[in-house]
Regions:
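C-terminal and inter-domain tail/linker signature
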Residues: 1-167
Length: 167
């Protein structure tokens, strides 16, 4: 990992003299974890690791077919630009922008070829040099809007108990 390939936010965090040795190691672990394909991330996590996702999880619930979920084929040219990062003790928080081209299924939304730019926030808890827990929130409404799927959702029939009906 070279600092010239890192975002200014990560460079600032790594250069922070107030970081402890543990905090610097935790940040470097998260950066290594994020730098490899999804299939190769297990070596950075505890056994049985399962991240908590909010945002994409809602889209997954709409279409539970495992063949139509999000994977490396969904946005194959995906890049993540870290906008901000905070490290404190055993926690690392980051905000990043996912950018790329929608060329594979995203939770049932067929490939559109459209460019996407979506904000995501993540938090990782480190234990004994491995990621023990992680939580992520992605702006799924921005994603479905950019993929052209918003019109179908916005015009879907609503029940009388839907709070948006009377607004």
């Amino acid at each position: 990992m070279t600092s010239d390939t890192l975002s200014p936010a990560v460079q600032r965090a790594l250069a922070d003299p107030a970081l402890t040795h543990e905090e610097r190691a935790n940040l470097e672990l998260v950066l290594r974890f994020r730098s490899v394909p999804f299939a190769d991330r297990d070596k950075y996590t505890v056994d049985g690791f399962r991240p908590s996702r909010i945002g994409m999880a809602t889209l997954a619930a709409l279409n539970p077919d495992p063949g139509l979920r999000y994977d490396g084929r969904s946005i194959p040219d995906r890049t993540d630009r870290i906008l901000d990062v905070i490290v404190h003790g055993d926690r690392v928080w980051a905000t990043w922008l996912i950018e790329g081209t929608h060329l594979g299924h995203v939770y049932g939304i067929p490939p559109t070829g459209r460019a996407v730019s979506v904000l995501e926030v993540g938090q990782w808890r480190i234990e004994n040099g491995l990621i023990a827990e992680a939580w992520f929130f992605v702006d799924e409404l921005a994603l479905i809007h950019q993929l052209g799927a918003w019109d179908g959702l916005a015009s879907a029939p609503r029940g009388a108990d839907d709070p948006g009906v009377n607004q």
